[in-house]
């Protein structure tokens, strides 16, 4: 599959729902967005967003990434349908995100105790991000009742 990546500042309602379903299928169940309103609330808290949608050959959204500003620093979130894993598409998507900035920060779950909605163990993507040039800031963590994650950072050399 040769994916097509489309970049846009806002998502349509249909796109949001597709992304929300991918989110709920691929991320740990504890951080799911149960309703479209939950996903809208998440997005509305972010500023200066740019969305990157990965479409397959049937023009179906199979992945999504987003860059946004937090405290004047560029952050990102990214999720791919499991059918796209280990095909280079995630790396291609990251390359697209990196092409418009000199720095990116993100939160990554770094343990293997979480379960996805289908009951499978969630595989931490830390190694994927390290392979793609990110550094793990082990001393900076996000610890809440629903998520435990480590900060990752990429800087243009």
Task: Describe the residue ranges of each PLM region.
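Short glycine/proline-centered loop/turn elements that form peptide/ligand docking sites
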Residues: 123-125, 141-149
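A short, internal acetyl-CoA/4′-phosphopantetheine-binding micro-motif in the GNAT/acyltransferase core
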Residues: 77-86, 110-113
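Conserved acetyl-CoA-binding loop-helix of GNAT-fold acetyltransferases
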Residues: 86-99, 122-124
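Conserved GNAT acetyl-CoA-binding A-motif
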Residues: 99-117
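Short amphipathic alpha-helix that is part of the acyltransferase structural core
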Residues: 1-37
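Conserved beta-strand in the GNAT
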Residues: 53, 59-68, 74-79
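Active-site rim helix/loop that mediates acceptor-substrate recognition in acyltransferases
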Residues: 28-52, 56
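Conserved active-site alpha-helix within GNAT-family acetyltransferase domains
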Residues: 111-138
